[in-house]
Amino acid sequence: GYYRIAEMADYNPVAMINEQIQEREADDFGASVRATLNVLPIEGLKWDNFVSYNQQRYQSNSYRTRYYPSTIGQDGVASISNEYTNDIQYESTVNYSNTFNKHSIQTVLGYAYQRQTGEYSSMGNQGFDTDDGVTHKIGAGTSINEGMASMYSYKESNTYIAFFVRVMYNYDEKYLVSVSLRRDGSSRFGKDNKGG
């Protein structure tokens, strides 16, 4: 006799949807605060501060039954993935500006800090006796006993720091001099080049 395995295009898309489960949950949280302090009695001197925090949590559960076209013969395929990230930023600047006679000066002295952290994990298994509630009992698949299940997890963290100075001098609205200095450091830089 003769038979062939149908291409994906030969399958009913509605049936394909019914033979898989996709569950996703996401939580986002963010907050920021900015504050400015006028430093008296020095006129024109201000201290600015900004801080922000962002956090994200994401979970995805996926299951394709034994009748899903691409997983036929595998008795169902399940996977679970989790992701957690947060980002903290802080920036502080001291600003001074003043005008006297024909002279005008503006200066900024600043510091910036950022830290990003991420945690990631995933697991997959197949070979289930039933299609009910598989993503909540992923260890029930037979592939884990055969050493064929998959799992991984890792955590990463990166830090960025910067110091900067800007000075601008203007005389009589005709002559302008500007000087900027900046130094950056990051954990992403090479081992012997953390600052630049």
Regions found by a protein language model. Give the residues of each.
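Small-side-chain secondary-structure face that scaffolds active or pore-lining regions
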Residues: 26-30, 34-129, 187, 191-193
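Transmembrane beta-strand segments that form the barrel wall of outer-membrane beta-barrel proteins
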Residues: 178-189
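Short, well-ordered loop/turn elements at secondary-structure boundaries
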Residues: 108, 171-172
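Outer-membrane beta-barrel transmembrane strand signature
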Residues: 1-39, 142-166, 170, 176, ...
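Surface-exposed loop/turn segments flanking beta-strands in extracellular/periplasmic regions
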Residues: 1-15, 61-78, 119-150
